[in-house]
């Protein structure tokens, strides 16, 4: 029965992807019906904020994005620092320590939601609502706006205006869908209140303080925006965030909704729907491979316990919630790292070595399907690399969407693809070379190495999940992961926007018999191969020293 539920969940991922992709294309390309509904409200916002409707260059678009995001980081930083003297603080929580406030503000603006604090004890209701929830809307709206400009550039059209795209992302996508999802979560038993904690009497007569808050609205945008940060420190393992299997499936659907829809949006906007389908199917195959790998490993259980003759028919249940089970915990772990959300319904630090390898690889590749917007930018980056390699092998100038891929584009892409592993491996080496980093490791040996690399991989990929055995709430970890999150977020977005702007200016080359098509199964295979080979070449040595070595040791 559990496998039937898994298949149904997978089918739901597939069934909602195309309709959502069509809606996104209409939402950002000026559908008359949507303009009638949302247009008056949006024009009022533009009038109040002084936004003028004009097309920006890629530099203007990128500058607008960085300045607005930077302003939000500063505002929210001071909210965290001053929350102790601000209203909506029934628990009288003190202001955040400076480096933790720095890390948290960047974390949520970068759509990472890495949490070096426990949500219910570290933030007031004001900080949760005005600081955290506000950024949970603003961060994915930023990247969804940018990916629309990116696709327009690939299609040879004007990039548009960042502030208009940002507003449309909020009014037409995130606010309405999150509102409806929050109502469903309330129906499933997720609390939504501004009242303080409830004191309850336990069976043995002791008193217990039960924390609550505006959880349903928080969880809705947490999953829809691929944010991932928990209202509670236990994240989606907490019964108030994720009461049962229905809420669990809805959370996974929300995580996958926009990342899986964007290939279809892309296909419609560039005038090649088949290419969008090829990208979707290719990535879904990689996703399935990851799910099968982690599930098989978790169901086989801990090799060390197997060697002792201990039977555990449910697989490795350490760190998992009984109400979700091993299979759905594995699916959730695959979804949350494939969609770069970072929410967890099981503790990733307790996964088997090969089970923990799958989330790690998903974040290292950062393309299957990746987070809202940012992931799709990486997908096209790998697609262009696949085209470039194919062109070199047959001695032709590579072409993508009828545009020649030349030195300028490949230099930008080369720098971008190297920057991600440089952040991960460089900062991991720094942490391992100083006691400021190694003192936080709770496990010696191979697992300890994986803890460190996982933290920086999660930060660079803007995922936010962690091997929570790491004691990361220290100035060293707060500052270094904050820098990795900021650089990992904005560097690739800006460089790939420059690539799209460069391609926009090029004339379309007429298609000939020798043109390498990017809308067939051959390209899909080369595309998958490029992702796997580039990822393996870059990160394989670390994976051998970490989870693979741990697995062989346990065997």
Curated annotation (Swiss-Prot):
GO terms for cellular component: plasma membrane. Signal peptide: none annotated. It is found in: Cell membrane. InterPro entries: KdpA. It holds the Pfam family KdpA. GO terms for molecular function: P-type potassium transmembrane transporter activity; potassium ion binding. The keyword Transport applies. The chain crosses the membrane at residues 2-22, 60-80, 130-150, 173-193, 246-266, 278-298, 374-394, 412-432, 483-503, 525-545. It is a multi-pass membrane protein. Keywords: Cell membrane, Ion transport, Membrane, Potassium, Potassium transport, Transmembrane, Transmembrane helix, Transport. It comes from the Bacteria. The system is composed of three essential subunits: KdpA, KdpB and KdpC. Part of the high-affinity ATP-driven potassium transport (or Kdp) system, which catalyzes the hydrolysis of ATP coupled with the electrogenic transport of potassium into the cytoplasm. This subunit binds the extracellular potassium ions and delivers the ions to the membrane domain of KdpB through an intramembrane tunnel. HAMAP family: KdpA (MF_00275). Belongs to the KdpA family. NCBIfam families: kdpA (TIGR00680). This is Potassium-transporting ATPase potassium-binding subunit. It comes from Bacillus cereus (strain ZK / E33L). The lineage of its organism: Bacteria, Bacillati, Bacillota, Bacilli, Bacillales.
């Amino acid at each position: 029965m559990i496998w039937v539920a898994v298949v149904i969940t997978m089918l739901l991922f597939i069934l909602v992807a195309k309709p959502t992709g069509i809606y996104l294309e209409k939402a950002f390309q000026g559908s008359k019906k949507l303009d009638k509904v949302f247009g008056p409200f949006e024009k009022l916002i533009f009038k109040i904020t002084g936004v003028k409707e004009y097309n920006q260059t890629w530099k203007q678009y990128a500058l607008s994005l960085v300045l607005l995001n930077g302003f939000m980081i500063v505002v929210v930083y001071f909210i965290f620092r001053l929350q102790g003297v601000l209203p909506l603080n029934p628990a009288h929580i003190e202001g955040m320590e400076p480096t933790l406030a720095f890390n948290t503000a960047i974390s949520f603006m970068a759509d990472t939601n890495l949490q070096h604090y426990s949500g219910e004890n570290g933030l007031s209701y004001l900080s949760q609502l005005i600081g955290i929830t506000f950024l949970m809307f603003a961060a994915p709206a930023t990247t969804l706006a940018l990916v629309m400009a990116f696709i327009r550039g690939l299609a040879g059209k004007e990039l548009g205006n960042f502030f208009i795209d940002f507003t449309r992302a909020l009014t037409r996508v995130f606010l309405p869908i999150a509102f409806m999802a929050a109502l469903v979560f309330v129906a499933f038993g997720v609390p939504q209140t501004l009242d303080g904690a409830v004191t309850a009497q336990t069976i043995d007569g002791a008193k217990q303080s039960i924390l609550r808050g505006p959880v349903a609205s928080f969880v809705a945008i947490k999953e829809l925006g691929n944010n991932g940060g928990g209202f509670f420190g236990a994240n989606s393992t907490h019964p108030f965030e994720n009461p049962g299997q229905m809420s669990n499936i809805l959370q996974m659907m929300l995580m996958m909704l926009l990342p899986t829809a964007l290939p279809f949006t892309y296909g419609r906007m560039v005038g090649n729907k088949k290419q969008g389908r090829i990208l979707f199917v290719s990535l879904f195959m990689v996703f399935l491979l990851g799910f099968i790998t982690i599930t098989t490993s978790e169901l086989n259980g801990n090799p060390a316990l197997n060697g002792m003759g201990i039977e555990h028919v449910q697989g490795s249940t350490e760190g998992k919630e009984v109400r979700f089970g091993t299979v759905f915990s594995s699916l959730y772990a695959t979804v949350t790292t494939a969609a770069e959300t970072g929410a967890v319904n099981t503790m990733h630090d307790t996964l088997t070595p090969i089970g923990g390898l799958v989330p790690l690889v998903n974040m290292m590749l950062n393309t299957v399907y990746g987070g809202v917007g940012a992931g799709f930018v990486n997908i096209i980056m790998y697609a262009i690399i696949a085209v470039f390699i194919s062109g070199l092998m047959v001695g032709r100038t590579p072409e993508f969407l009828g545009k020649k891929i030349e030195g300028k584009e490949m230099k930008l892409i080369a720098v971008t693809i190297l920057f991600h592993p440089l952040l991960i491996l460089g900062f991991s080496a720094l942490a391992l070379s100083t006691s400021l980093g190694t003192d936080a490791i709770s496990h010696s040996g191979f697992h300890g190495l994986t803890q460190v690399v996982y933290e920086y991989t999660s930060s660079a990929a803007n995922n936010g999940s962690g091997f929570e055995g790491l004691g990361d709430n220290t100035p060293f970890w707060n500052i270094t992961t904050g820098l990795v999150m900021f650089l990992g977020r904005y560097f690739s977005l800006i460089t790939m926007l420059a690539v799209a702007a460069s391609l926009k200016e090029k004339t379309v080359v007429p298609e000939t018999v020798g043109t390498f098509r990017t809308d067939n199964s051959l390209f899909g295979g080369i595309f998958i191969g490029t992702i796997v080979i580039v990822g393996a070449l870059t990160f394989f040595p670390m994976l051998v020293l970490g989870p693979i070595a741990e697995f062989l040791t346990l065997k």
